[in-house]
From Swiss-Prot:
Induction, as annotated: Induced by srfA, during development.
Alphabetical UniProt keywords: Developmental protein, Disulfide bond, Glycoprotein, Laminin EGF-like domain, Repeat, Signal
Protein name listed in UniProt: SrfA-induced gene K protein
Glycosylation sites: 64, 136, 160, 226, 385
Intrachain S-S bonds: 330-339, 342-358, 370-388
Protein origin, superkingdom: Eukaryota
Organism whose genome encodes this protein: Dictyostelium discoideum (Social amoeba)
Entries under InterPro entries matching the protein: LE_dom, SrfA-induced_signal
Signal sequence segment: 1-23
Pfam families for the chain: EGF_laminin
Laminin EGF-like domain location: 325-348, 384-408
Amino acid sequence: MKKMKILSFFILSLAIIIGIVYSRQCDDKCKQDYPYSSCNGNLNLYRGLGYDGNGNVIFSGKYNSSQGSGGFGLPSIFSVPSSGGCQLSKRFDIQGEILDGPGYTALDYFYKYLPQLDRYYVRFNQRGSPIFSIYNQTSNEIKAVFNIFNTPFVPAFSQNESAPFFVYGGYGIYGLAKYPTDRSDAQQAKLIYQSQIVNGLEIDGDQLYMTTYQGQFLKGSLNCLNCTKDQLQLLVTDSELASATSVSGFALTSDYMYFSYSGGIKGYPKNGDASRVRKLVSENVVAMISNGDFLYYQTDSGVVKSVSTSGNHPQVNILYTPVSDNQCQCSVGFSGDDCRQCDNGMVLWASDNGIPMCSPLNSLGKPKTCYAAYQCGSSPFIICNGTCTCLPGFSGNDCTLCGNGGEVIWENGYPTCVIQIKKIIT
C-alpha cells in the first residue's frame, strides 16, 4: 500500500515577521483612511476547535472589514471560557500569510492544540494545496508537516501527551508513536489498516474508532500492523451519516461516539447499540470536539456552543457569537495615526482586493514578502516565490553564483545554471 503522498512544497519552514498590527477605537478617520485602515466587522471564524485543558475553547479567525469585503489584517488565535459568558480573548496573531502572487499562503483550518507542548496544528492553503502545519507563536514560524493535496486526510491525536501517538487516515490508516513535526514523519508511519478511507477518526487507549463515507462506525486496534480492513469491527451503520455531504467532526465521550454534520450532532454507544441513538442538536455544525461529558461545536454562522452529553435532556450553552470589537486596525505592517507609515519597508498591493501590506526589508534591501518578481529588483537571477529567492542552482547575495564550476547558459534573456558532470575514466 502507498503511504500518503508527500509532495515537495515551498514552505518547509517560514518565519516572516510582517509587523505589529496597530489598533484603536473605530472612528470616522479610520473609515476615511481605508484601505490603509479599516474598522473591524464581525469576526470570521475558520473551521476547527481546540481545548486548552484549562477551561477554554480555542479557535482561529480574522475580522472582516466593515468597509470592504472579506478579511482585513492578520488572522489570530482566540479563546473563550468553556463555562460560557462570551468573553473573547485574543491569544496571538498569526504571521506569515502571503495573500497574492506565486507564494500565496493563507490560514484556513484549525486542527488541534496540545497544551503540554503548547503546539498548534493548523492548515494553510499554499498555492491551492492544503498543508498540515505547525504554527509556532514564539518564533512566528510556519512549519509545514504534510502536503495533503488530493488526500482524504483525517488526523487523530492521543489525549495523553506523555505517551504521544498520532494516527491519520488517507488511502489507508497510518500511525506514528509521536506527534508529527516534519514531512519525513509520513515516511516513518506504519500502516495499521490497508485501504480503509475514513471521514472521522479517534484514539481511545489502544483502540481506534472511525466513521466511513458509507455510514459505518468501525472499531479497530492500534496494535494492528498492515491489517486488512475486513479485520475492523462493524459497530453500527447510520443512514444520515451515509447521506451526509461531509462529516465535520467525530468525537468520543466515556461511553458514546458522536459525529457532526449539516443536520446536527448524533451519537451511538461505543458498543453500537442502535436502540440508544441520541440526537443532541439539529443545526448545521461545521466543527466539533469533546472534553469530558461536553461537546463543543461551531455552527455554519460561526457561533461556538457547548452541549452536555449527560442526562436525558442535553443543555446547549452559547459560548461565543461573532461580533465586531469596534476597533480600527491598520493594514498589515503599517503604523501611524493615518496608518500610512511603512518604515524600512515596501508597500505591496493585493490584486484581488486592493489592500496594501507593508513588508519589512531584509539586510539586502529586499522585501521579506513579495507578490511579484519586480519587487525583488531587476536582477534576472532572482524570482519571487513568496520571498525573493535565487533561481535554481544559483546562490550568493546577488544570486549570481552558479554551483561549483557551473556554467551560466542564457536563453531568451533568462539564465540557467548548468553543472557539468565529468566521467572519471579508470
